Regions:
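Conserved SAM-binding loop
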Residues: 86-203, 215-233, 247-249, 321, ...
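Short, hinge-like loop/turn segments at secondary-structure boundaries
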Residues: 138-142, 207-210, 252, 329-330, ...
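Acceptor-substrate binding/catalytic loop of class I
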Residues: 32, 37, 204-219
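Conserved catalytic loop of SAM-dependent methyltransferase domains
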Residues: 18-24, 207, 236-254
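Fe-S ferredoxin-like electron-transfer domains
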Residues: 43-116, 121
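N-terminal juxtadomain amphipathic helix
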Residues: 1-76, 236
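Hydrophobic, well-ordered beta-alpha structural blocks that scaffold small-molecule cofactor pockets
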Residues: 87-88, 246-261, 265-405
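General small-molecule cofactor/ligand-binding pocket signal
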Residues: 14, 141, 233, 355, ...
Length: 405
């Protein structure tokens, strides 16, 4: 029996949901030499009976310490970060303070922070990303919150940032306690994670991916933060699908409670004596998976009967999961993505080739299905402007497809 990554309680034998033919990863994308050995995997989605955290009962991907972003420089994300930084700094009077982004990747969001009157630095585990960030003039060091005692260079800091990183961590409590030790008294933070509420509300089963080992709600995220020495000052849903919280370090020693399983937790969970969490209902996810499978394959059949072709736009975890679970390998021409490091590779499990947008002019597709929640309108505008009016544009919207043109 595996234990909860947040509180150490034993996970139930019966999962909430079993997903087969899932991509093994969203970032270690197969190339021409490795694609033949790549295959889909089975994942069990479970809920901790003590703290309520929904999670996969498996080992994390081997690159969970690294931050690899494809959409960091999109207009949507840059404007969101700019708004978040402005609010954080102005509301909490953080001008002139020392900020550190924990898991900063190439510095996509750190570069936006340099527009503001603060000291901006970052920590990143992946060496080649550290090099790129430094070449771009950013103050980034190589490191990771490996243990509670890990010391960040040039600390302590006044404010930390963590963008969609915590959900990858197999020991989220260790990471949070490490960050807390590297903050000054009263230090603050801004954290974002994908929202389980969003996934359940819109039955977006394609949001589930091996890379994201945990799926937080505001409640389970706040429980985790409280148990590891932070109080939540503000919380907000951003971009429809992401939880965003502003936190402050609490003072005093952190208690280390025994879990119901009798094990020391990896970093706290439900408070002793608190009520058991309500079971999460994932029946909508299972129904959505069946319906979307029928809808997408119905689209493929219609186009093929007319002698037409289909491409997907979005080599993200959503696109990978959709293509794999609906078994689109060999039925779709290619997946378009603007990230150069993905181009020339193959989608995990489905093995669809990933190409640059310019590939369309060499091999036009009659229809394009956008699978990139949060970026749909931005991508649709690009298709209209660059590919002409003859292309049929569709998008995955929540639990169904929608024709945009």
């Amino acid at each position: 029996m595996r234990a909860c990554i947040a509180c150490g309680c034993g996970l139930p034998e019966q999962p909430l949901m079993t997903l087969d033919h899932m991509p093994a990863s969203a970032q270690n994308i197969p190339d021409g030499e490795t694609v033949a050995a790549d295959e889909g995997i089975t994942l069990n989605l479970c809920q901790c009976p003590s703290c309520g955290l929904v999670q996969f009962d498996c080992e994390p991907v081997d690159y969970y310490r690294d931050v690899i972003r494809a959409g960091g420089f999109s207009t949507t994300m840059v404007e969101l970060r700019r708004r978040q930084y402005r609010h954080l700094i102005e509301t909490w009077h953080l001008e002139g303070k020392k900020f550190v982004e924990v898991g900063c990747g190439r510095g996509e969001f750190l570069s936006v922070l340099t527009e503001f009157p603060v000291s901006a630095s970052g920590i990143e585990h992946k060496e080649d990303l550290v090099k790129i960030a430094r070449e771009n003039g950013l103050q980034v060091t190589r490191g990771f919150a490996e243990t509670e005692e890990t010391v960040f260079p040039d600390g302590p800091y006044d404010v930390f940032l963590s963008f969609n990183f915590l959900e990858h961590q197999p020991e989220p409590g260790v990471m949070l306690r490490c960050i807390r030790r590297n903050l000054r008294e009263g230090g603050m933070g801004l954290i974002t994670v994908p929202s389980l509420e969003y996934i359940l509300q819109y039955d977006g089963y394609y949001e589930l991916i091996h890379d994201h080992i945990a799926y937080y709600t505001f409640e389970t995220l706040e429980n985790l933060l409280t148990a590891n020495g932070f109080e939540v000052l503000e919380r907000e849903m951003v971009n429809r699908d992401t939880l965003s919280v502003i936190v402050r370090r609490t003072e005093g020693e952190l208690a280390e409670e025994k879990s119901p399983a009798g094990e020391l937790p990896a970093g706290g969970g439900a408070a002793p004596g608190s009520r058991r969490p309500a079971p999460v209902d994932v029946s909508g996810l299972a129904a959505s998976r069946r319906y979307i499978d029928e809808e997408v394959n119905g689209l493929v059949d219609r186009l093929h009967s007319q002698g037409k072709t289909l491409a997907i736009w979005g080599a993200s975890h959503q696109g990978f999961t959709l293509a794999a679970t609906t078994r689109l390998g060999g039925k779709v021409s290619y997946i378009i993505d603007s990230a150069p490091f993905k181009q020339g590779r193959f989608a995990p499990a489905s093995h669809l080739p990933i190409v640059a947008p310019e590939h369309f002019f060499q091999e036009p597709a009659d229809a394009i299905l956008i699978v990139a929640p949060g970026y749909t309108e931005e991508i649709a505008s690009i298709i209209r402007e660059r590919f002409g009016k003859q292309v049929e544009i569709l998008a995955l919207k929540s639990n169904h497809m929608e024709t945009l043109r």
